[in-house]
């Protein structure tokens, strides 16, 4: 694994930024050095009673096509066994159902699903299972303005109990980054990392709380061959330490394919093969579909799954695999425990996943504090939007003030005052709402990933988002109110001015809430991407 400990000399250029908010002081460093080795080993390893075997039976998934078109079945009664300490690939052509199955197993998708999913012989309790698992998406959903160390610190503060000492959190971060080969980039902004480094950082963030099961959607997409090998080797190492690692992959090279322990091949929602990668060639020979000499078995089986050799071959493969029930192609298949054996080995008493406390590891107040800290830091580093908001309020305030110049002192211009108030209302509503509608969807992907992986609750995120934006909203509203109020010669009474300002601020805050709602429902980002 030396390749994971050193970066390529010709990698992308990196730069460092100010990290005053998240720094490791000398006292903490001394404590890290004195931390016992046993504690560090405990971080990256799971014992026998913590390992998780996943068994799914007769899984079907249907989607609605509308009132007139009825429903369509995506997965057709598939079965499978995903044992612990294995790196498992869900493989198949586009549209085979790989990502759908991954989402169902992880609990990311629950509606329209039928069948049984058992964890260590017991029926899966979705909220309990989520506490010991992590889901890593295909695209790297990271805060680009934060450094590697800052991202890791936020993850540690949110995912580890508040009783965990700071020096222990720093020891965990340092160990993970060292193992993943990111330690020398701790002070590098995430946006300046290479694709492989971002993928490893995505994995590192979820390793903070040491999950037992990890789901990864297309972890090698967009990476070069060396980065692919680094990522898969890393996943294999994590699996050897006791985790169950499940990832989708489209069409791996022969080298990458051999790194997987088990492969689950799908085609049109059915299982074609379920077993060891070493036994795939033997399986194909056994059903009279031998892989040509010097041919990548992964390429050949994908061609079979696509129907290039006829639809009858797909039916033959599904029949031979018994739609996932046939486990004879596992290594040491005779030693696999049945459901009763798994129940005995992993009793409810010893399973961490049956803890039904809150999904998040920290209280809501602590989550709000950490999210506000992150939000203010990002605002500090990206001042473009802040400057634009201030300039927009100054420009519109001057324009309205000049249009309705001294209308407040002229009794004959009551209608002009009404028009002024209406214009102010429209300005506060539209500028605030449209700004939120456009910018909030950019945060949605990160929100979905972090919330599903139990970093924080939705109420904590909304509260922190509102509080971070509140000082700027007050400042912009105050500037606008001062310009309009005095240029239009409104009555110079403190009570009237405070009432005018308070109502304006309330309109701004309400508009921001509506903007968040509309931005969450109607994601406008794809529209801008098209144009």
Q: Predicted segment positions?
A:
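Topological signature of polytopic alpha-helical transporters
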Residues: 1-79, 84, 93, 119, ...
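Conserved ABC transporter NBD signature motif
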Residues: 80-83, 106-107, 113-125, 129-131
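Conserved catalytic motifs of ABC-family nucleotide-binding domains
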Residues: 127, 140-150, 163-164
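Conserved ABC ATPase signature
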Residues: 189-193
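Hydrophobic anchor residue at the start of the ABC signature
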Residues: 203, 231
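ABC ATPase C-loop
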Residues: 206-207
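Catalytic Walker B motif of ABC-type/P-loop ATPase nucleotide-binding domains
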Residues: 214-218
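Membrane-spanning alpha-helical segments of multipass transporters and channels
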Residues: 272, 286-289, 381-531
């Amino acid at each position: 694994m030396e390749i994971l400990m050193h970066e390529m000399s010709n990698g992308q250029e990196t730069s460092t930024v100010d990290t005053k908010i998240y720094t490791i002081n000398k006292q903490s460093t001394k404590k890290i050095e004195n931390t016992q080795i046993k504690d560090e080993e405990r971080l990256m390893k799971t014992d026998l009673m913590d390992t998780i075997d996943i068994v799914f039976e007769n899984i079907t998934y249907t989607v609605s096509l509308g009132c007139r078109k009825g429903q369509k079945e995506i997965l057709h009664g598939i079965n499978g066994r995903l044992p612990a300490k294995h790196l498992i690939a869900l493989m198949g052509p586009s549209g085979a159902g790989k990502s759908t199955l991954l989402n169902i197993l992880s609990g990311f998708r629950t509606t329209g699903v039928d069948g049984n999913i058992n964890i260590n012989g017991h029926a899966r309790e979705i909220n309990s299972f989520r506490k010991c698992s992590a889901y890593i998406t295909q695209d790297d959903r990271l805060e680009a303005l934060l450094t590697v160390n800052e991202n890791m610190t936020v993850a540690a503060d949110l995912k580890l109990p508040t009783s965990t000492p700071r020096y222990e959190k720093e020891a965990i971060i340092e160990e993970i980054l060292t193992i993943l080969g990111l330690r020398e980039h701790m002070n590098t902004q995430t946006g300046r990392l290479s694709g492989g480094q971002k993928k490893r950082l995505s994995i590192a963030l979820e390793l903070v709380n040491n999950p037992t099961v990890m789901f990864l959607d297309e972890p090698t997409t967009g990476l070069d061959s060396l980065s692919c090998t680094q990522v898969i080797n890393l996943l294999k190492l994590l699996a050897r330490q006791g985790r169950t690692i499940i990832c989708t992959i489209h069409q791996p090279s022969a080298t990458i394919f051999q790194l997987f322990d088990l492969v689950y091949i799908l085609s049109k929602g059915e299982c074609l093969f379920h077993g060891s990668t070493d036994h795939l060639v033997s399986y194909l020979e056994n059903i009279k579909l031998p892989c040509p000499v010097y041919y990548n078995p992964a390429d050949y089986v994908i061609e079979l799954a696509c129907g290039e050799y006829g639809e009858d071959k797909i039916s033959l493969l599904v029949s031979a695999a018994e739609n996932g029930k046939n486990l004879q192609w596992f290594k040491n298949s005779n030693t696999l425990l049945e459901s009763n054996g798994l129940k005995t080995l992993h009793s409810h008493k010893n399973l961490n996943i049956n803890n039904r406390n809150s999904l998040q590891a920290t209280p809501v107040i602590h989550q709000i504090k950490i999210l506000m800290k992150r939000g203010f830091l990002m605002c500090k580093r990206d001042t473009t939007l802040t400057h634009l908001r201030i300039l927009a309020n100054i420009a519109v305030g001057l324009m309205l003030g000049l249009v309705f110049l001294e209308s407040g002192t002229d009794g004959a211009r009551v209608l002009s005052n009404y028009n002024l108030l209406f214009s102010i209302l429209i300005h506060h509503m539209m500028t605030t709402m449209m700004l939120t509608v456009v910018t909030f969807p950019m945060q949605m992907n990160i929100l979905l990933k972090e919330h599903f992986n139990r970093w924080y609750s939705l109420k904590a995120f909304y509260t922190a988002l509102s509080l971070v934006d509140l000082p700027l909203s007050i400042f912009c509203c105050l500037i606008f109110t001062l310009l309009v109020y005095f240029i239009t010669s409104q009555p110079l009474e403190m009570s009237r001015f405070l009432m005018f300002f308070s109502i304006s601020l309330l309109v701004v805050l309400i508009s921001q809430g509506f903007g968040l709602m509309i931005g969450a429902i109607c994601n406008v980002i794809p529209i801008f991407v098209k144009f």
